[in-house]
Amino acid sequence: LAAEGLFRASILADLAMIMADVAIGVAFYYLLKPVNQKLSLLAALFRLAQAATLGINLLMLLIALQLLTGDLYTAAVGPEAANALAYLFIVAHDIGYKLALVFFACSILIQGYLLYISRYVPRILSVLLIVASLTYFAYSLATVALVNYDAYAGMFEMALVFIALPAELLLALWLLIKGVNLEVSEQRNTVEQMPAEALSN
């Protein structure tokens, strides 16, 4: 393995990303819980399912690393077989990563809907997040459903780069710079409570 240190660093970076994603999922749960507790919980569970899938999927890279660096394995099966097996596990990791995006797509689809009805952020950002979720769905499912996926791989990857990623980036920047508009949600809740209070009186 020519760059073992870089390979190990990439595994650690993935692990850090997974842990951060769990924290983000929990934060969104508490943010959207007042809007709809059940849907917010469902979105968080999908996020955790994605994190669990990605965490297990890291084992593929660790096994590949052992095959490429462990003299015992090379001696047992031969260098060519060890390299072939390592490549197989790296390919399996790539497939597992794409399948995990199904859970991510479900999570941000629900979050996009809840953000839309809550008006915590401008609705255009919520719509873009929903569109991003559909893009992730299409990308992930196409890798399994399409026999000739390689012929369309470039198109799906371009959709991620120019649709899904900008939508996520815009929402993240808005939340970091502007935050959420809790006043709009509070006003909406007040309006919804007024008819009930009028009836009780």
Which positions does each model-derived feature cover?
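Hydrophobic, aromatic-enriched alpha-helical segments typical of multi-pass transmembrane helices
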Residues: L1-N201
